[in-house]
Amino acid sequence: MSTLVKQSLKELACLEDLQNAIGRYAHQMGYSAQVIQTGFRMMFSHWNDAEFHGFIQNEIPELDARYFESFFDIGLSFEKRRSILPCACSERIFLVSASTVPSAAFQDVLLTLLLPVHLIHRPSHSQSGFFQSVHTWLSLKAPRLAERWELIEPTYEDLYLSKIISSCDALNISASQKTIEHFRTLRDGLPIEKRPKKWIEHGHKVSAIILFKDDFDALTDADFDAIAWDASIWDQTGCLSPKSIYMECSQQEAEQFAHQLIAAFDRVAEQLPEIMPDTASLAKRNSALIMAEIEGCRMMHANRNHDCIIIHPEGGFPILLPRILNLFPVRDATHELVTRTAHGQALGTKKLLSESEKNLFSQAGYHVFCGLGQMQNPPLTWFHDNIGTLRPYLMCNA
């Protein structure tokens, strides 16, 4: 591709421009500034020509290659955007962002604005101030994008939300199942002709790591650091963060593994410090750990952050809370992973999986397969939840 892309969307991949907003709102978003900066830096590393090209081929394969450069031009007019699109798309989109991983919401906003749409964005309470600051910044950097991005207050006021839902022809929500169900109720309370034609949901998913016997026996210090990194980015929140490790080993070997991993967590903590969890979160965490101990789990705690490793006995269930990594020493990791996971997302491995193995794990929902240390670093070409980022709004096959 030509250098036009580098002068357009990639021009916004500037962490320095976001430093003020990150520093001011990091604590409100629930992360340390170092964690947020690292997450954005990893995301921006994928804003390059090759991945832009792959992104368009995945999301809008019908787009004429002659228009690839124009598509990423942040100064392109609304009318021109509409003229180069190969088919119709939603015109008013209501985007409801999750309360975790602000870089993901940031990227969703900017990529969606590359379509000829008006975007109504409801960030979470914790990220509202940050995105207000980002909107001000974008108004200076890319006014033609910012003028089509409308931020609203993160309210749960039903009448207000119903009015917005009825005014849009697409709604995209990333949230807990409870919040998703609330928005469904609001939609179902509207006359059929007032309901959005496109309804996209991204509910909670669970990611994991699998270590086969040969992989377990060949682990290096670099592998332990990579696992700790995967579980520390974004404080182990977000759908790509590993919550459990299924590994083919004995309980005794699992304890030795945990000792080595705790040391890795302490090393990674220098780069990815956490902020002190609030009182309610600590109380919930402590209650869960007490119950796990009663159920026969072994635990090890890091010295720096609140990282905790839990070694489960046979038949145990993972604790899905931040900074808790569940270990399951088993005989057949494949069987345990497939039978115990309902909503898988990313699967980290030491070795590359075969296509037949990927097909098997996809039965449990896993569709992101990557090496250790790369779980929270998806390429721009990742087809989010097997749904996509722009594809759901298009009517090319309608």
What are these regions (language model features)?
Residues D225, I233-A398:
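NAD(P)-dependent aldehyde/semialdehyde dehydrogenase
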Residues F131-V134, F183, L211, F257, ...:
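Hydrophobic packing residues within well-ordered alpha-helices of enzyme cores
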Residues P61-E62, R66-F68, D73-G75, Q177-I180, ...:
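Short acidic, S/G/P-rich loop/turn micro-motifs used as interaction or catalytic elements
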Residues I120-R122, A170-I173, L347-G348:
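Short catalytic-loop micro-motif centered on adjacent basic/acidic residues
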Residues L63-K141:
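Conserved small-residue-rich beta-alpha loop and adjacent elements
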Residues A105, L161, T179-E181, S354-E357:
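Short, well-ordered alpha-helical microsegments
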Residues M1-S90, A346, K351-S354, C370, ...:
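N-terminal Rossmann-like NAD(P)+-binding subdomain of aldehyde/semialdehyde dehydrogenases
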Residues A142-Q251, Q376, W382-A398:
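Conserved NAD(P)+-binding/catalytic subdomain of aldehyde/semialdehyde dehydrogenases
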